Each structure stands twice: as C-alpha cells, then as structure tokens.
Swiss-Prot record:
Transmembrane segments: 10-29
Source species: Bacillus cereus (strain ATCC 14579 / DSM 31 / CCUG 7414 / JCM 2152 / NBRC 15305 / NCIMB 9373 / NCTC 2599 / NRRL B-3711)
Disulfides per UniProt: C73-C76
Membrane topology: Single-pass type II membrane protein
Subcellular location, record wording: Cell membrane
Protein's pathway: Protein modification; cytochrome c assembly
Any GO MF annotation of the entry: antioxidant activity
Gene name for this UniProt entry: resA
Name of the molecule in the record: Thiol-disulfide oxidoreductase ResA
Length: 173
C-alpha cells in the first residue's frame, strides 16, 4: 500500500515538473524565435498617452529604442529614469524612445508616467498584440531598431544607465 502511494506521488510530481518545464520553455524560449536580428521590424500603430499616433514606419531615418515594460515590473521601474534622463540628448541626435506598456489600465500607466515625469512617448499595447508580434517574453525587453527599420539587437532584462547609453549610441543615425 505504501509502495503504491509513493509511486503515485512520484508520477504526479513528474507530471507537474513536466508541465512547469513546458510552461517555462514557452514563456522564455519559444517566443524569442519570432524576432530575427537583421530583419525589418514589424510595423505597428499605437496612440500614446498624449493622444498622438505613433507608427513605426514613420520613424524610418531615426534610430528607435522600443521598450516593452509594465508598471508592476521592478526592473522596468529602475531603468525608466535612465531612459528619461538620456532621452533629450539622443532625441536631438535622431533617436526615438518608445515605451509600450503590457496592456495595463490607462490610470495605472498614467500614474506611473506622472510619478517619474517621463518625457518620451508611452503607449499601451492593448491586447498585447505588439508583444505577440515581437515575441516578447519576460519584461523588460527592448529592441534596437536602426534608421533603416531593421532590428539590430534584442535586450532582455534591466539595463544600467551606461548600458542604455551604449545602446542608444549604437542606433544613432
């Protein structure tokens, strides 16, 4: 009887481990295959919190730092002030920073933007359609897009001010 109970528990544990492993694989690895470095960045249209329409293809000729984030994400919260500090300098040089929130409420995002005094365009990815198109897994995830609209690099995780400045230099036209 005890042997059967132990065997049953081991089988259940293996099934649970397999399910967790598959979920982690889907979340962290499978999505990354969708976006290829060197390929044209998929176009999108969003409206930022100021009511301005942003279409990626309209930004050709500029470098674009495309950041996917969430208000609940502590690493995202840490890097936002660096992006805000560097934005004016690199905007003058032809680089645009666009922050796309992962489908949270307008109020939550506006409160976050006001709290940090963010000056760069912030929009909400309603229904996470752009996140799906770009194959974003964990947040924060950023894409470097060059002046020709090609994806130069994908960065997953929090960035220091120095790292962020290096990335912005990399896509300066």
């Amino acid at each position: 009887m005890k042997k059967n109970r132990l065997l049953f528990r081991v089988i259940i544990l293996l099934i649970l481990c397999g399910a967790v492993g598959f979920t982690l694989y889907q979340g962290f690895f499978a999505n990354k295959e969708k976006m290829q470095i060197g390929k044209e960045a998929p176009n999108f249209i969003v409206t930022d919190l100021e009511g301005k329409k942003i279409e990626l293809k309209d930004l050709k000729g500029k470098g674009v730092f495309l950041n996917f984030w969430g208000t609940w994400c502590k690493p995202c919260e840490k890097e936002m002030p660096y992006m805000n500090e560097l934005y004016p300098k690199y905007k003058e040089k032809g680089v645009e920073i666009i922050a796309l929130d992962a489908d949270e409420t307008d109020i939550a995002v506006k409160n976050f933007v006001n709290q940090y005094g963010l000056k760069f365009p912030v929009a909400i990815d309603k229904g996470q359609k752009i996140i799906g198109t770009y194959g974003v897994g964990p947040l924060p995830t950023s894409f470097l897009i060059d002046k020709d609209g090609k994806v130069v690099e994908q960065i997953i995780g929090e960035q220091t001010k120095e790292q962020l400045e290096g990335y912005l230099k990399k896509i300066t036209p």
